[in-house]
Structure formats: structure tokens, C-alpha cells
Amino acid sequence: MKRKPDIWSKNPDSEDLKAAGHYLSLIMAEHQFSSLITALRHAPTIMHDAKDLLRASQTHLLPKDNPHVAENLKRIKKGKKLSPVLLIRGNAPKGITLTIADGHHRICASWYWNEDEPVACRIVEFVKPHKPKA
């Protein structure tokens, strides 16, 4: 059986870190999301199965013809590597799901490319930082 090529780059693109910051700014205070972006920038890149990421985040597989999923599939077919997905670890005992800060479309494209393809990701813990003093 022919092995499919590695589709993941080791480091996230700067625009993906920026997009993660924009998303996180909608769900938490600036002093919280900025520390998470810094942590994501320096976190190691690890691999997780797409199906597990979708389950842990309680998100659904987007359709293959979704414009962003389709664009990522084109990139894969052209041999261009995808940026790792950026994640905030959930907390099951507290009912907090995994947060996909950036990369849901890449997870879905990876699944369509090869459902057994591990997804490159950077994952950090949410630790409530001290609020800066005014």
C-alpha cells in the first residue's frame, strides 16, 4: 500500500496565529487570549487523529464542498503543507470542550484526504492568568 505524503508543516503560519487571536478575543478577555497565543507560538507540534479532535471539540465534519475545506484539499493535492491546528485543551470534569482556536477546516480536509491521517496540532492549557493591575 502506497503511503500518502506528509501534509503538515511543523510550525503554524503567522496568519493562523493571528486568526486564532481574533477568535479567542471573542470568547475571553485580552489578557487571557494574548497569553494563550504566546503559548501556542512556543508549544511543540504533536499529532492527534482528526476524529478525536472533532469529538473532543464537539464540532462536526464540514462538507467536502465547503469552500475552505475544498481549498485545503487543493493545497494538499498540490503538495503544499498545511499549518498545524491551534487548540486550547478542554476540561471534561468541568464540561469544557476542546477549543479549536484555528484550523477546523484543515482538520476536515485532512479527514477527507485520509481519515487515518494524524493531524499536526499545537495544544495549550487554559490557565487563568492574573488580570493586569490598572
Question: Can you describe what each PLM-predicted range is?
Answer:
Residues M1-N66:
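An acidic, glycine-rich, mixed-charge low-complexity segment common to nucleic-acid enzymes
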Residues K2-D16, L82-A134:
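A short, basic-hydrophobic beta/loop patch
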Residues L40-T99, W111:
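Short alpha-helix boundary/capping and kink motifs at helix termini
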